[in-house]
Amino acid sequence: MMLSNFGSYNRFFVKCMDGSLGLQELPDNSVKLVYGSPPYPNAVRDYGTWRSKDYVKRIAPFIDAAKVKLREDGFLVINVKACREKHGSKMNSTRSLVVEKLAILMEEEWALHCVDIEVWVKSNPVTTGLRVACQDAYEQILWFAKSNPWSINLDAIRRSYSETSLKTYDSSYYKPRSNGLTYVRKQKKIQPNPLGALPKNVVSGPVSSKRVKHQAVQPEYLPNKYILATTNEGDLVVDPWMGTGTTGVEALKLGRLFAGFDVVQEYVNIAEKRLAEVPMVLKLDNTGV
């Protein structure tokens, strides 16, 4: 299938290849969201090891390609975990700042706009046996927009109000200022939003327990949030580090199109099977993307 016609008759396209090259095969300005979790710094995996000293250099081709392929209203979201650096047997390991460096470069070198740097707090982190710092229980999510101003679907990711918040609303009022310059001239009760509370920039939940042949399977709720927040039905979502296809499964469930790439053929085969099993939500036509 020609990628230039992607979306005409297919909900998804996956291929075993380097994701930066896969992105280059997509039409320019066609992608609404590039979401993915690249290899973590220094993590030894069957799909390779990206050393922290070379990390920015390794990820640069992906960001270069993403910027060209993203629509002007598109977003790039990267979930990545920092690592600890070893400094010899007589010194303590230190936390690497490579993720922070990457975030700064995404703004300064790639001229992307930081929507937020969110945090994924894991309720069941893997025990590391670390004795020189606290248990590592979070990962960072670098959320950037191609253009500013940007628009996100906050209503799609609102959350339920806590009992404490609802009690606060019951006793809270807008009070008029004595100078009369505020738009509230009379005392007025504050009402909670009927769609729910504003989403937090902290995502909490367990690490995926799915029995899939992959060393770092994403939980569904992570890509789900950013797909809902940044895309609409029929938009194209791309994961250049697809793994076994969790991002794609969530995209298809929500009626989006999906393209994914991975360098391990076994993962691509698993992803293709999982994606094919997702029930049809989006009605396709022959317009393409």
Where are the regions that the model predicts?
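Core catalytic lobe of class I
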Residues: 1-270
